[in-house]
Amino acid sequence: MSKLPQVKGDRLINALKKEGWYVDRTSGSHVIMRNGDRPGTKIIIPVHSKTVKPGTLSNILKKAGLSAEEIKRLI
């Protein structure tokens, strides 16, 4: 597995949109995304001015079914 990229929340949201995820709603500084192909699965993305922490990014990618290489390609 390659190293996770450093990415901000807004860029991660745009990358996930390319994979079929959509913004369901926002709650404060967090965006909740869903995918029609994966009912019941939601991803919560923090949208702050800093990059998403590696552990958080790893969990987001795991829920989305994406690898580090795939997210680098999408960003």
Residue spans of the language-model regions?
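C-terminal structural segments of small proteins and small subunits
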Residues: 50-75
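Residue-level preference for alpha-helix termini and adjacent loops
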Residues: 3-6, 44, 51, 73
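N-terminal first-folded block
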Residues: 1-27, 36
